[in-house]
Amino acid sequence: MRKRKQQVYNDNLIVSRSNKRSSTSGKETCYFDPIPVDLVINILSRLSLECIARCRCVSKLWSSIIRRPNYNQLFPVKSSATPRLLFVFKVARELFFNSSPQHFNPNNSSLVATSLQKTSSTRFSQLCRPVHGLICSQHIEENYLFALISNPTTGEYIALPKQRMEEMNSETIIEKVRYSFGYDPIDKQFKVLRITWLHRGSHEWSSEYQVLTLGFGNISWRNTQCCVVHYLLEDSGICINGVLYYPARLDNRKYTIVCFDVMTEKFSFTSIDKDMTIMTNLSFSLIDYKGKLGACICDHTLFELWVLENAEEHKWSKNIYNMPYSRSRLEETSYLKCAGMIASGEILLYPISSANTSTDARYPFIYYYNLERNIITRVTLQVPILKQFTYARLFYTFSNFLENVTLI
């Protein structure tokens, strides 16, 4: 019986076959015919998200196929197409990402969160909302401030070019830097907006605005112009239909909502309602309210919701809901922050620690608030990975998180 020998060239993933007799042994060695690239793509398209992530390391060819910008559109990965909840816990100097189903069973008041990936929190200071499965986080390392773009599902991350936090010259000092993260659905591009506050002299303030586009090759910051000096507040914003909305303070100390078109990289501004005084509150959140920008705050007794009905006309609608639970029933040691609205129309709320309190998140919970029925349901989270720690903090909760195999 003839022996068959398989030879694989890892660089090009071609498995060849030919009949060739050895001149020394007289034995015949068989090789396989090349596997068409289309067949390789077809095989990859049948794999799960986890398998796809591992297959990137098989060879350069497989990696290049999966890295194609339109790969996920041509061959949808068998990942969870259902939006999920994303929980970010901080343990010591690490951030742990966990996800769970977004909808809960009324007969079971708990959700089981599965562990995704973790990342070092090197003086972690801010986390932007997920955009198509990717997350932008802000970190400080020695005298440098930088952002990480990470994929909680695959564990892949990339550090963006750093900025040194020191004097730019003898008179200019960087006071603060904020990042926002958006996505252009037309050109299918992820972009990061960086706003730097500058202090010149004793009273002169200004801002610099830079944009970075994720993609192949070298990535770098480029300057963009904005005719109105503004300062990004603590909320990093939310991207809805290609527009990045974020709250800001103007040079005259008034507040506004900035609308940054991710594709054109142009700024516009929407005035807030004269009665809208919630933007500086700790529990202030921007949400996607049925495709419109929503701004909300929860003070344990009232839920205040503003919806931007028309950005050009600066028209807002206001709704006030009397919450059915008292402050004591809703964990008076913490503030409640809005994680977003899900398809069922329910608002998700989660506790965050105030300046004087600290909530142990090894036993986390969230609330589902049905606005129409005015019913709040408390749901506990089962997070097995947290059992190995003595203390953890729930930093963020996000709704409508979609797993993504996108490489960065």
Curated annotation (Swiss-Prot):
Lineage top rank: taxon: Eukaryota
Pfam families, alphabetized: F-box (PF00646), FBA_3 (PF08268)
Domain F-box span(s) in chain numbering: 29-74
Sequence intervals crossing the membrane: none
Disulfide-bond pairs as recorded: none
Residues forming coiled coils: none
Signal peptide (residue range): none
Protein's UniProt name: Putative F-box protein At1g53550
Source organism (scientific name): Arabidopsis thaliana (Mouse-ear cress)
